[in-house]
A protein has these predicted regions:
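Acidic, His- and aromatic-enriched active-site or binding-groove loops in soluble protein domains
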Residues: 60-78, 186-210
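Short low-complexity, flexible loop/linker segments enriched in glycine and/or proline
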Residues: 55-59, 184-185, 275-277, 380-381
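A short acidic (Asp/Glu
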Residues: 179-183, 320-322
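Short secondary-structure capping/turn micro-motifs that flank functional sites
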Residues: 49-50, 176-177, 198, 371-372
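Glycine-rich, mobile lid/loop segments that gate access to catalytic sites or pores
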Residues: 169-180
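TRNA-binding/sensing appendages of the translation machinery
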Residues: 1-90, 94, 150, 154, ...
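Positively charged, Gly/Ser-enriched RNA/tRNA-binding surfaces
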Residues: 21-36, 47-48, 82-83, 91-105, ...
């Protein structure tokens, strides 16, 4: 029996050239964040199932990869309801909240964190969407003022700009304004999450599609009309603490990047409590990144409330866009030492070792005499900047 060689649906093999591009994107993002005072941490890919399943993770809860218990823990005859006690993380924010609660005594306040790692979601694969994909997150924990939002909204766009994207804008809203919009449309607060799921589809299905979706969920025509009318709300007409904060954020950030208020912006995570935002590009249908404030997520670990704000870059989308532009990472100096006769092996190794620590990439190749020409051409195609044929023990 021969096994299939293609990776599982929604995952991908990454070739060396693509890996070089991914490393470049990671390094650019990481270095930008470090310049703004953020430090990198790492959390496990596997978390306890109760953390993931009781998280207000929105639609992601339906796409959770669960890990079956093993050995004596998987006692099917005992009639256990839960066959899994672990799961793969579907974002980096939940693990960060657990990490902070576990290590807060050893961390500065506020804590400015960088996370770069894979996450998993059991969703239907499509172009630009994978079941395993990388996220690049930056979060500020312990600061309740809007300085956190402003710092993130001037840091993440800078990383995106350094990656070569210019035609983008920041859109911003606030979960408190969303709730106000729903409640003033005579819709019960218990339906807030349901209504937000419909509003979140407006870019895909349009206003009429949202109207139909809400009707199917049982909202009356009066409620739907009131909500649709408020979807055109002008920020200047709003007078609340949330509206004033959004205005101030826009006033500061707009000096550096284009920012606009979007009353229909939802973001999928139910744990957001305040400002929410996205970076949208005209070069890609969808966002290049997004995030928001989540001031209650850490409450499940401790009694005192800890405010927090985070922003996640759409790493895979950015990589796909750069690949579509045929972007090539600047080639490092690569030197190949080629020999035919085995007696030159030691000499080739010695020459290679002389370059250790000089920042040059070296490789050794033994080639058959009748294939030397073909091999040299192949090495040039692979990006070697210098090819040395070792055929003399004295030089």
């Amino acid at each position: 029996m021969k096994f299939r060689t293609k990776p599982a649906k929604g995952t991908q093999d990454i070739l060396p050239e693509d890996m070089a591009l991914r490393n470049y994107v990671q390094d650019t993002i990481r270095n930008t964040y470090r310049e703004k005072g953020f430090t990198q941490i790492q959390t496990p890919s596997v978390e306890n199932i109760e953390l993931l399943s009781n998280s207000d993770g929105g639609e992601n809860l339906r796409m959770l990869f669960k890990i079956l218990k093993r050995g004596e823990k998987l006692d099917l005859e005992a009639g256990e309801k839960e066959l899994s006690d672990l799961g793969l993380r579907f974002d980096l924010t939940l693990p960060l909240s657990r990490f902070y609660a576990n290590n807060r005594n050893d961390l500065p306040m506020p804590f400015k964190a960088i996370q770069i790692g894979d996450v998993w979601r059991a969703e239907r694969p499509q172009k630009g969407r994978y079941r395993q994909f990388m996220q690049c997150d930056v979060d500020i924990i312990g600061e309740s003022s809007i300085v956190s939002e402003i710092e993130l909204l001037t840091t993440v766009p800078e990383a995106i700009k350094r990656l070569g994207f210019d035609n983008f804008k920041i859109v911003i809203n606030d979960r408190r304004l969303l709730k106000e919009m729903v409640l003033t449309s005579l819709i019960d607060e218990e339906l807030f999450g349901t209504v937000c799921i419909s509003l979140d589809k407006v870019d895909k299905i349009g206003v009429e599609g949202v109207r139909k979706d809400l009707a199917e969920k049982g909202l009356t025509e009066v409620q739907i009309d009131a909500l649709i009318k408020r979807m055109d709300t002008n920020l200047a007409s709003l007078d609340s603490d949330a509206a004033r904060e959004i205005k101030q954020i826009i006033d500061v950030v707009s000096a550096y990047y284009p920012v606009e208020f979007d009353p229909t912006l939802v973001r999928g995570m139910g744990y957001y409590t305040g400002a929410i935002f996205e970076v949208q590009s005209s070069e890609f249908k969808g966002s290049l990144g997004g995030g928001g404030r989540y001031d209650t997520l850490l409450n499940k670990y401790q009694n005192d409330p800890i405010p927090a704000v985070g922003f996640s870059i759409g790493f895979e989308r950015i990589v796909d866009l750069l690949k579509s532009k045929n972007m090539k990472v600047e080639t490092e100096e690569k030197i190949a030492f080629v020999y035919i006769d085995p007696i030159y092996l030691s000499k080739a190794v010695a020459l290679s070792q002389e370059l250790v620590g000089q920042g040059k990439i070296t490789s050794l190749y033994q080639v058959k005499k009748n294939k030397i020409g073909k091999k040299l051409n192949r090495l040039k195609e692979e990006g070697f900047t210098e090819i040395i044929v070792v055929d003399n023990l004295d030089k």
